[in-house]
């Protein structure tokens, strides 16, 4: 009788469902590239077009300091009916795909970078790894909230709710902070990994 070898229990994969090399570096690279391309399409496409329609104002999505009720009304009025329709589609349609892609690509990248042996001999504690992954998930969640608020603002126009604008503005500000923190963490871990990789190749 042939028996299948039993995989040792791992707290990183308690059900034993993940392949040993999941995620692969190739998968992480593909997802990061796809996320970057989608961001570039939105930034240089719809968001740039909305900025031109408004006479140079910055769309809600990329205002790091948020926006007041008066600023939100001024922007939506400046882009006109054409711009408000354009904001709903294609911009918000494209932006519906960005948050999940961002969370998955950055989450898997952080998981990959903290796999045993990548940034140190000792394994990174599981709680730390989950905490790292929580940052891009937070960013994506806030992006979804922001998008929902913008949909409500476009739908209610010209009647704007001050509460909706405040929630949207706060979501935008914290989203940008969480995004910057995610990129900083990922870049820092990548530098440590590359330095260790270089050192091993030099001294081995």
Where are these regions (language model features)?
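Short, charged juxtamembrane terminal tails flanking transmembrane helices
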Residues: 3-4, 195-204
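Interfacial loop at the N-terminal end of multi-pass membrane proteins
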Residues: 11-91
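Membrane-interfacial loop-to-transmembrane-helix junctions in polytopic alpha-helical membrane proteins
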Residues: 17-27, 80-90, 121-131, 160-174
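Alpha-helical transmembrane segments
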Residues: 38, 100-108, 139, 181-188
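Membrane-interface loop-to-helix entry segments
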Residues: 89-104, 170-181
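Hydrophobic alpha-helical transmembrane segments of integral membrane proteins
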Residues: 104-152
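Alpha-helical transmembrane segments of multi-pass integral membrane proteins
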Residues: 133-188
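A juxtamembrane structural motif centered on a specific transmembrane helix
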Residues: 185-199
């Amino acid at each position: 009788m042939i028996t299948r070898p039993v995989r040792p229990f791992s707290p990183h994969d308690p059900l034993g469902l993940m392949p040993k090399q999941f995620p692969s570096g190739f998968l992480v690279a593909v997802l990061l590239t796809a996320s970057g391309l989608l961001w570039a399409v939105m930034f240089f496409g719809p968001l740039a077009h909305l900025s031109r329609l408004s006479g140079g104002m910055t769309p809600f999505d990329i205002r790091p300091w948020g926006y007041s009720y008066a600023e939100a009304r001024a922007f939506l009025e400046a882009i006109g009916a054409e711009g408000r329709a354009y904001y709903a589609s294609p911009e918000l349609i494209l932006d519906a795909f960005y948050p999940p892609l961002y969370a998955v690509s950055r989450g898997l990248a952080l998981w990959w970078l903290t796999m045993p042996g990548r940034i140190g001999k000792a394994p990174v504690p599981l709680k730390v790894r989950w905490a790292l992954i929580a940052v891009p998930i937070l960013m994506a969640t806030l992006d979804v909230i922001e998008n929902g608020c913008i949909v409500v603002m476009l739908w209610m126009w010209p009647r704007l709710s001050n509460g909706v604008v405040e929630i949207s503005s706060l979501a935008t500000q914290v989203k940008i902070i969480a995004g910057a923190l995610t990129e900083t963490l990922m870049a820092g871990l990548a530098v440590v990994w590359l330095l260790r990789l270089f050192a091993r190749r030099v001294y081995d």
